[in-house]
Amino acid sequence: TPIKSSAASDVYKRQIIKNPEIDIVVEMLGGIEPATSFMVQAMKAGKHVVSANKAAIAANYGLLTETARENGVRFLFEASVAGGIPVLTSITGALQSNNFIEIMGILNGTTNYILTKMTEESLSYEEVLKDAQDKGFAEADPTADVEGIDAANKLSILMALAFDKYVAPEDIPTKGISKITDRDISSAALQNKVIKLIGTARMEDGKLQYLSLIHISEPTR
């Protein structure tokens, strides 16, 4: 349950921040605040922090990573992007000697599920969204997913790690899938293509040349 009241905040500080037996704090609140403030407090208290909160991390990447560095603690957020795929660890670990020039991928499972069902079963956006919500794949309020906000958060984190350049999620040109119709799906199919929501960014000559979260028609296989 998100901690919002001042009383709950006091409990957090007393039972967690000031507890010398706690070395690692796992943030599971969701949202930007109070999650960001609580993570910063934990770091300043000398505690390592683990989080999958892509919204807070993308919005305050510099603050969180710098606070961790200044206080000699670790800030781990692998699960914030791509779930069980260790993409962030790969970037900062096994592949860190590489020069990354481009990021491109489907960054949100909910939108991919919706577009796939619309394509393969000739269903409307509204029908598939309701199906996804009934199955627990989509939230009751799906805005963050279907309008590309979730994917923009993930792209922001990926760029920060791969390119060492931070771009705030709100500065990433973003287009969701809520306006995609069965006519759009059919038009793509006539060209032997499918519609996907792709997050992409590219570095050229040390400059971020292109970044977006847009619809791309991909050839079917």
Would you name each region that the model predicts?
Residues 1-8, 12, 214-220:
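Single conserved hydrophobic/aromatic residue that forms the stacking wall/gate
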Residues 6-45:
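N-terminal glycine-/serine-/threonine-rich beta1-alpha1-beta2 phosphate-ribose binding loop
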Residues 30-32, 55, 80, 108, ...:
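Short glycine-rich anion-binding loops that position phosphate/pyrophosphate groups of nucleotides
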Residues 35-36, 54-78, 88-91:
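Rossmann-fold NAD(P)-binding glycine/threonine-rich loop
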Residues 49-50:
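A short hydrophobic/small-residue beta-strand
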Residues 93-147, 151-153:
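Conserved anion/nucleotide-ligand pocket segment
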Residues 128-213, 217:
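Substrate-binding/catalytic subdomain of NAD(P)-dependent oxidoreductase enzymes
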